[in-house]
UniProtKB/Swiss-Prot annotation:
Membrane-traversing stretches: 51-71, 97-117
Compartments where located: Endoplasmic reticulum membrane
Major location (coarse): endoplasmic reticulum
Native organism taxonomy: Eukaryota, Fungi, Dikarya, Ascomycota, Pezizomycotina
PROSITE patterns referenced in this protein's UniProt entry, alphabetically: CNMP_BINDING_3 (PS50042), PNPLA (PS51635)
Name of the protein this chain belongs to: Lysophospholipase NTE1
GO function terms (MF aspect): lysophospholipase activity
Broad enzyme group: hydrolase
Biased composition (Polar residues): 316-334, 738-753
Chain location of the short sequence motif GXSXG per the record: 1248-1252
Active site annotation, chain numbering: S1250, D1368
């Protein structure tokens, strides 16, 4: 305590001193001194023993410490510091320093500042956040676990039966019950055989295994003509002997397993068309008492052959007897027919009949079996179900509408399965063309004689004047159509207006007939037309409305009262004074209409429409009944059609778009109409067209535009003889692009024939015009006047196997496909007639192939075969998509190939009898043709020439592998995995789904623009778009329920068969059935998102992932402006590992507000407007005329748009630009790009090497020429600076420079932009010297991989990327054309600017002195070539593989090789920027001009924009007469 007291006293003393200092001159007491005094008093009063005293002392100590601090602070500020400053400033200092020391100090300061700037400011590129390359994701596989041949669920009879009757298409419940209620089953023990010729019905295997055999070599020895025998020849009956199948008499065709039909497509057509006549007799020959077998068919003369055929069919055992009345009615024919007396037709001027008597068509064989020469043997105990023929006959009578639909489905599949396979795959050209040739005898109907004299001459004179008036610039070969003033009004009318017009016409005819009894004839010049009408109606009086025979003056009054466009109300019995009368304009129009009506009548009779049904009173009343006509118009809505504008049929029906059942019409289906009435109704749709000699009316491989009736002249049915051979020997680039990882993975090059497709992909070595001007055609048949061209292809809506060419100047009547399809919908007898004719004309070889081929329908994810399975069949894709995968050793899967429509799988394995090289599964629901190995073996033994076609196919695959080994070796990405060849995944796409990422994306507007771009680009066979409204309008409100599922699938399959590309627009809610349909039907899914929106995963993406779709998925980002911010694309791709098809940037203006994905329901106005726009776009393909005397391309060509770029990608027509390396010589590439842009050539994909990678990246970033010039010029200026090069030198341990200046120059051009943000697809290649391979980079920082691709060894350091060292890509491949081809590019512009090799011969001996070589280099008088230096040897060694790759690139199909004259410029001549740029620009202009002049293939050519459809449709150039 003494210490504390002493301390306190000292503190008091110091505080007193402070108080004295601070309190001087202040009268008021100091608060600090007062506090200290008070604390001291308290401490003294209480002492140290109490707590209060202790606290007071602590406070006293704190106050004393504060006072001491204040004291010293005030002293330092007021006394010490001023004193020190005064002393410092008053002192004199002298520093002595020499210049060396000063320079060293300044140098140190400059070095420090330079270090800060160099490593803290100028190398910002090295401090960018790491963004590694995006790995190409593996394709998700969700294969079905069901084994082949085992059905899901309970494998019972019902499942197997339903699987077998899928071949009939969609069957409603009543139709299904009617077809199966008389079905019988038959048990077969193992080894039991039975003759299918005795089975008059549809047979299918419910349980077990059956082998199908056909008569073999003994038949060929008896009939030595082999497969080329006449189909009408007599065949021996098989009733006399039934040898065992193991003998030589029979060959094994195929094996039929559970759920597969034993009957063929031909058998089904035979069962449905038993009672259909081959040729419908004219009305003049019809007897009033003839009857028909069913309500579907009109009265036709039943011959004795048909009656006997019916007797034989009705006497078949196990056939129900409920058709006794029908058979008895067939037998109770007039006696004179039974006696075979000749029938004398009445005298008439009607010339529609044949001028010479037609001999009856001989029967194919003595039996009417639907299974000729076929027997079956059960391998195991088997259950067979049989639907008798009587069930089919009963179905025709009860449900004729459903029957027509089934026949349509069967006929379509027969064309797609049997005929297409025989023609394209087996090379049976003669057999298929024989059908076309022999069909002419059924489709010939002559015009009336009075239309062949002066009337025909006047018609020719009109066309002659028009041809003379046309200029040389007009292409007459496209055809000149006769002007029809009513055609425009007809096109603008709807189905409802047509119905009202028809009713009005019928009512007027009845009114006239009631007033014409007491009339007088007032002849005038127009009576010629009425005379012709009288001639035409001479044989149709029984079917016409009852007119009186007296002349009528009311006719002329009516003619004056109404418009000339309504000239349907005239008296057909007014006779003219003279036929040689000068016709006025209106009468000329009437004569033209008369020609149209007469041609239509001949057409209708040729296709099976006759007026014989008019003799029936009920039929007459039906024709005149407005209620029934309206009902019939509505009835056609429920039929399946292949309309070009099939989705518009909803406007013809009810307002809600619903349709009635197929079976609702029942027995009310009217008989065949009167051809005259139908011709009057449709005459405005008929065109009379003139084609000069040599014009092509129908091209081989295209869909028939319609029916051509020859009025005068000759048409030649021919085939391109070497078309198939060229496809086999010289496969197109599309074929060579398939991803084949091994020789076992092959595919067929035989697709649907596409004329001139080869020339579009043959590079600049093929003259397209020369190919078109000199086709190698082989004539098949000649169509004379009265004949019909395009009958089979038009009625069946399938591609044409033939080519129709004008043999002479020809005048034809043309009825478009849409009109034909409407007729087929309303009158099913047209389909049945053609089916009957086909069954009568088919050669036996085609029939046997039809029995062996199997039509399969597999579900999405279902496995067709597994890796290592036995190769028992070849598969051909009808529609859908398949993927072949193989297992990797690490447990993953590699995609080997994808197969689309028309491609085949497994030929090599079947021929070599090896096991499958991979697992094949369906990406989506797919239809296949199964070509069994047993059929191939049978054909090889019986007809060895058939196997030549398949042998050529396999040889072409092997040749493609040899010519382009990269397709077999695959492409390695940066991780070393085998990436998926994109060409195989974008090749032959048939369906594309447009799916929004989330609600609010304008997918409807996007799909409309995409469809327009596809139309202009020229998608093969056209493109169409489907949304939910279109499907509901066409199929009704039950389209998406269980009942309509098969109906919807059949409708979608027909659309895929008809169009080259179908776009499914998911414009409904995320859980709607239509959204599920879009995803399930897609070969490729376009995920459309708004670039400015949130990159989070949307609800539609979750829905798609939940469906486990294995289709290709492409991300499409919509931008308001043509620019993408850096890093934006990476944010979208980061969470979407399932995007395995790349991404696209598309500029499309849209409202920033949320756009409802499914707008609320509105009246039919908007829907009608959308459909009218689509209709106009379709018509524009055929009516638009190209502007003459203009270049192929213009700078503002719309083909450079983003939608056109996406359309070319989907169609496999992408244009690639490959830029090679060459240092400063690469500046010439900028000039070539400018020339291409001015020529209007679009560029979709850019790839480059070295300096080409730099130029290509600049162009891909902006997709424009202007921005790249400035950036490239700045970079060239930096590279030309010697000071920068000198400052960048370093000790040459790894390179001569540090690479900083080089990096800085590239970074200033690109910044932190990533390759994903480039507007165009881009890649650059490098050489990975760590792993000794080439690598291609499509993601990551652009400057980084461009720098790596430009890293010249020795001059620059290699770049380290994920542990690997990357150098210049030119060491391996300086012109990456093969990789560009693998990305799916169709046409490739390759610009080579590399240095030329010095091939000077060397002879410096076995040893060489370095001193001699040095002096020899500087000796101007030496005649010995200078030996290469060490650096030159190393450089040549490095580029050895690149030279070989360059030579392969020059000869690659589809590659247009360009090399500007830049040999005089060096690698580092960057200072000559403008000079080199000018050389490239001038060369590009000259090269493209020469290419265009000599007809070289450019990416926008004549085949785009729908020009092919201009020549043969309703819109050839009209004659203004």
């Amino acid at each position: 305590m003494d210490v504390v007291n002493s301390t306190a006293r000292a503190a008091v003393t110091s505080a007193t001193a402070v108080t004295a200092v601070t309190g001087t001159g202040d009268r008021h007491p100091n608060p600090l001194s007062s506090a200290v005094a008070a604390a001291s008093d308290v401490a003294n009063a209480h002492g140290s023993s109490s707590w209060l005293g202790l606290f007071a002392r602590v406070v006293l100590w704190l106050l004393q410490f504060v006072s001491m601090v204040l004291y010293y602070a005030i002293k330092l500020a007021t006394i010490s510091v001023p004193t020190l400053l005064y002393t410092l400033f008053s002192t004199s200092l002298t520093v002595t320093m020499n210049a060396t020391t000063l320079m060293l100090i300044v140098a140190a300061m400059i070095g420090a500042i330079s270090w800060v700037v160099r490593y803290r400011y100028l190398n910002m590129y090295s401090r960018l956040p790491p963004e590694p390359q995006r790995k190409e994701p593996d394709v998700d596989l969700f294969p079905d676990t069901h084994e082949e041949g085992i059905k899901s669920g309970l494998s019972n009879y019902f499942d197997e039966f339903l699987s077998a009757i899928k071949i009939f298409g969609y069957l409603e419940r009543p139709v299904f019950h009617e077809l199966t209620r008389s079905m019988q089953t038959r048990k077969l023990i193992a080894g039991e055989s039975f003759n299918l010729e005795e089975e008059k019905g549809f047979c299918l295997v419910v349980d077990g295994l059956v082998e199908i055999f056909v008569k073999s070599s003994s038949y060929n020895r008896r009939y030595p003509h082999g497969p080329y025998f006449s189909p009408n020849s007599e065949a021996p009956s098989s009733d006399d002997e039934h040898p065992a199948p193991g003998q030589q008499r029979y060959q094994l065709l195929t094996e039929v397993r559970n759920g597969a039909p034993m009957s063929s497509l031909f058998s089904i057509m035979s069962l449905f068309t038993e009672d259909v006549p081959l040729r419908h007799a004219d009305e003049d020959n019809s007897e009033p008492g003839t009857t028909t077998h069913s309500g579907l068919f009109p009265n036709y003369p039943a011959s004795a052959d048909f009656r006997k055929s019916r007797v034989r069919m009705d006497s078949v055992p196990n056939t129900p007897q409920m058709d006794a009345s029908a058979s008895s009615s067939a037998n109770n024919l007039p006696g004179q027919l039974d006696r075979g007396l000749p029938h004398v037709p009445p005298i008439s001027l009607d010339g529609t009949g044949f001028s010479k008597p037609q001999r009856p068509v001989p029967k194919r064989s003595n039996t009417t079996s639907a299974h000729p020469d076929i027997i079956a043997r059960a391998t195991v105990d088997t259950t067979v179900a049989i639907i008798p023929a009587s069930a089919f006959r009963r179905l025709i009578k009860i449900y004729p509408k459903a029957t027509a639909h089934i026949v349509h489905v069967i006929l379509s599949r027969f064309q797609r399965v049997t005929l297409a396979t025989a023609y394209n795959y087996l090379g049976l050209t003669n057999e298929v063309l024989q059908i076309e040739r022999q069909m002419l005898k059924y489709t010939t109907q002559q015009l009336p004689n009075h239309l062949r004299g002066d009337a025909l001459d006047r018609l020719k004179e009109k066309f002659k004047r028009e041809v003379e008036r046309m200029g040389e610039e007009d292409d007459v070969s496209k055809g000149i159509a006769l002007h029809n003033a009513r055609a425009g009004r007809r096109r603008r009318s709807t189905a409802t207006l047509r119905k009202e017009a028809a009713l009005q016409a019928f009512s007027k005819q009845r009114n006239i007939s009631s007033m014409s009894g007491s009339s007088l004839a007032i002849p005038n010049a127009g009576d010629l037309v009425t005379h012709l009408q009288q001639s035409r109606g001479g044989g149709n009086r029984a079917q016409s409305v009852a007119f009186t025979d007296g002349p009528s003056p009311h006719l002329d009054v009516e003619r004056e009262a109404v418009s000339p466009l309504a000239q349907r109300t005239f008296d057909p019995f007014v006779t003219p004074r003279s036929i040689h009368v000068a016709l006025e304009k209106r009468e000329t129009l009437d004569e033209d209409n008369l020609f149209r009506e007469s041609i239509l009548e001949c057409m209708f009779r040729s296709i099976g429409l006759t007026g014989s049904g008019g003799s029936n009173k009920d039929a007459d009343s039906n024709q005149a009944s407005p209620r029934l006509i309206s009902f019939d118009q509505r009835r056609q809505k429920a039929l399946y059609t292949n309309h070009a504008f099939g989705f518009m049929d909803g406007l013809d029906g009810s307002a809600d778009g619903d349709t009635e059942s197929i079976t609702s019409a029942g027995l009310s289906l009217p008989a065949s109409p009167n051809p005259q009435f139908l011709a009057q109704e449709m005459r405005d749709e008929m065109e009379i067209v003139f084609f000069p000699k040599g014009s092509v009316l129908v091209e081989q491989g295209e869909r028939n535009p319609g029916l051509y009736y020859v009025v005068d002249g000759f048409l030649d049915i021919c085939t391109q003889e070497d078309a198939a051979a060229s496809d086999v020997v010289h496969p197109t680039s599309r074929t060579s692009l398939h991803a084949m990882d091994s020789a076992q993975s092959i595919r067929s090059p035989q697709r649907s024939p596409q004329p001139f497709a080869e020339s579009m992909r043959s590079g600049n070595k093929v003259d397209d015009a020369e190919i078109k001007s000199k086709p190698n055609r082989r004539s098949v048949a000649l169509i004379k006047p009265g004949g019909l061209a395009g009958y089979v292809g038009t009625i069946s809506s399938y591609r044409s196997f033939i080519e129709v060419v004008a043999k002479t100047d020809v005048y034809v009547g043309f009825l478009p496909l849409t009109s034909i399809e409407r007729i087929v919908d309303r009158y099913p007898i047209v389909l049945l007639t053609m089916a009957k004719r086909l069954t009568n004309l088919l050669p036996r070889l085609i029939l046997h192939i039809d029995f062996a081929l199997e039509w399969l329908q597999v579900n999405a994810g279902q496995v067709i075969f597994h890796e290592g399975d036995e190769s028992e069949a070849i598969y051909i894709v009808l529609n859908g998509r398949l993927r072949l995968v193989e297992d990797r050793k690490d447990g993953g899967m590699n995609v080997k190939a994808e197969y689309g429509q028309g491609e085949s799988i497994g030929e090599l394995e079947v021929l070599t009898e090896t096991s499958r090289s991979g697992t094949l599964h369906a990406i989506r629901d797919t239809e296949l043709v199964k070509f069994p190995r047993t059929l191939f073996n049978s054909l090889a033994q019986e007809h060895p020439n058939i196997t030549i076609k398949i042998s050529k196919i396999i040889a072409s695959r092997m040749r493609a592998l040899i010519d382009d080994p990269s397709t077999m070796l695959g492409i390695k990405d940066s991780s070393g995995r085998s990436s998926i060849n994109k060409s195989s995944t974008t090749l032959n796409l048939r369906t594309v789904a447009v799916l929004p990422v989330s609600a609010g994306v304008p997918v409807v507007e996007f799909s409309n623009r995409l469809l327009s771009a596809l139309t202009e680009v020229g998608a093969p066979n056209g493109a169409t778009s489907l949304n939910s409204a279109a499907v509901l309008n066409h199929l009704g409100k039950h389209a998406f329920n269980r009942m309509g599922k098969l109906k919807l699938s059949q409708y979608l399959a027909d659309l895929e068969e008809k169009y080259g590309l179908v776009i499914y627009v998911a414009d409904t809610n995320v859980n709607a059935p239509w959204t599920q349909t879009c995803v399930a039907q897609a070969d490729c899914v376009l995920m459309v998102g708004l670039a400015d929106g949130s990159p989070e995963i949307g609800e539609y993406e979750r829905f798609m992932l939940g469906m486990k779709s294995t289709a290709r998925k492409i991300l499409v980002l919509l931008h308001q402006e043509r620019y993408s911010n850096s890093g934006l694309t990476r944010k979208w791709l980061k969470n979407r590992v399932w995007i395995n098809g790349g991404h696209f940037h598309v500029q499309m203006t849209y409202s920033p507000n949320a756009v409802p994905i499914h707008p609320p329901a509105k009246p039919s106005g908007p829907t009608l407007r959308e459909r009218v726009q689509i209709l106009q776009a379709e018509i524009q393909k055929y009516t638009s005329r190209k502007v003459r005397h203009s270049p192929f391309y213009s700078p503002d060509a719309p083909f450079k748009g983003d939608f056109h770029r996406l359309a070319r990608r989907l169609c496999g027509k992408s244009v690639g630009l490959v830029l090679g390396g060459g240092g400063a010589r690469g500046i010439a590439q900028i000039g070539i790009i400018r020339a291409m842009q001015e020529a209007g050539i679009p560029i979709d994909i850019v790839g480059g090497t070295s300096i080409g990678a730099f130029i290509g990246a600049l162009y891909a970033r902006h997709a424009d020429f202007v921005p790249i010039v400035n950036a490239a010029k700045k970079f060239s200026g930096r590279m030309a600076s010697m000071w920068r090069f000198a400052l960048d030198l370093t000790y040459p341990s790894a390179s001569y420079t540090t690479g900083h200046e080089f990096n800085r120059g590239i970074f200033k051009a690109f910044g932190n932009t990533q390759i994903e943000d480039f507007w165009l697809d881009y890649y650059c290649n490098t050489t990975n010297i760590s792993k000794s391979r080439a690598e291609f980079h499509t993601s990551g920082y652009a400057w980084w991989y461009v720098r790596a691709s430009m890293s010249l060894a020795g001059l620059l350091l290699p770049l380290c990327d994920e542990g690997s060292m990357l150098l210049d890509g030119g060491y391996v491949d300086n012109l990456t054309v093969s990789h560009m081809k693998s990305l799916g590019s169709d046409v490739i512009f390759a610009v080579d600017v590399g240095a030329l090799d010095d091939n000077t011969p060397q002879a410096f001996g076995d040893s060489l002195s370095g001193m001699w070589a040095f002096f020899n280099r500087w000796n101007p008088f030496s005649s010995v070539a200078n030996p290469p230096t060490l650096a030159e040897i190393q450089a040549r060694l490095a580029y050895v593989s690149s030279v070989d790759a360059l030579e392969r690139a020059k000869t690659l199909p589809g590659c247009i090789y360009m090399r500007p004259p830049i040999e005089e410029y060096g690698t580092l001549d960057f200072g000559k920027f403008m000079e080199i740029y000018g050389v490239g620009y001038k060369y590009g202009q000259e090269f493209l001009a020469k290419l265009r002049e000599r007809g070289g293939v450019l990416p926008i050519g004549e085949e785009m924009g729908g020009k092919k459809g201009l020549r043969r449709t309703m819109a050839p150039r009209r004659a203004s007469i």
